Amino acid sequence: MFRRAIINKDTQVCMSLAARPSNFGTRFHNYLYEALDLNYLYKAFSPTDLTQAISGVRGLGIRGCAISMPFKEACIPLVDELDASAQAIHSVNTIVNTNGHLKAYNTDYIAIARLLANYKVSPDLVFALRGSGGMAKAVACALKDAGFTRGYIVAIDEASGKQLAELYGYEWRPDTDGIEADLLINATPIGMAGGNDADKLSYSEQEVDKASVIFDVVALPPVTPLIRYARERGKTVITGSEVFAIQAVEQFVLYTGIRPDDALFQKAAAWSRL
């Protein structure tokens, strides 16, 4: 699918900021712009200076900006207003620019909560959540709201790990030694394409073998080493590409005010994964 419309002075520009951008968001949003005949354009960037990049969003009239690892917390002081979701989680993945006023949201939470419900993941399961950054905060909040009462925040950084665990009434651990969990969640860059840990599992094979549900929020590649191994073992898997698609359509709604029907959403998500 190729963009037929000619870019002109009235074209609304949306963008993303990530340390390691993928083509998923670019293909997803531009597919929907084309399908709905909207005068919008989406482009991914990898900023060398976050403060200047956010200033550019404001100064150039960029309509919307997606925020990915590792900028989800660092951009908070750079915006004018936090939506209730971003304020509660203290993590941002979306910025909407309305006449120079930058308001930040967190649509990661929506995606995670929806997927836990769609896959009927029982809140009775004991979980292990690896990570304590912006995405981990959204996951922990969604788990708490879904009724999960027993779980571990596994984070090397003791300060942020303990803070996140205490906020939601969970237990912090520096590693997974001695943990037996039915639900394993990775909210770190382990397994992400282009990184030093791209080929690594975020949990050991033995830990995956003992679990029943595996949830990896890493979207690139669509099948991470963790997801591949879990599928081979017949586990229920929830992928980062599913998270990405749901949070992206919620961003699309914030940017354009239009909600695509489910059939169009599925087509855009499928196109994005090619």
Segments from the language model and where they lie:
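Phosphate/diphosphate ligand-binding glycine-rich loop within oxidoreductases
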Residues: 2-119
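Rossmann-like adenosine-cofactor binding region
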Residues: 168-237
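Short, conserved loop/helix-junction motifs that constitute active-site signature segments
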Residues: 5-8, 121-123, 145-147, 202-211
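Short glycine-rich anion-binding loops that position phosphate/pyrophosphate groups of nucleotides
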Residues: 63, 67-76, 134-135, 189-192, ...
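NAD(P)-binding Rossmann-fold cofactor-contacting core
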Residues: 146-168
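Glycine-rich adenosine-cofactor-binding loop
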Residues: 104-106, 120-148, 155
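Adenosine-phosphate binding glycine-rich loop
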Residues: 217-274
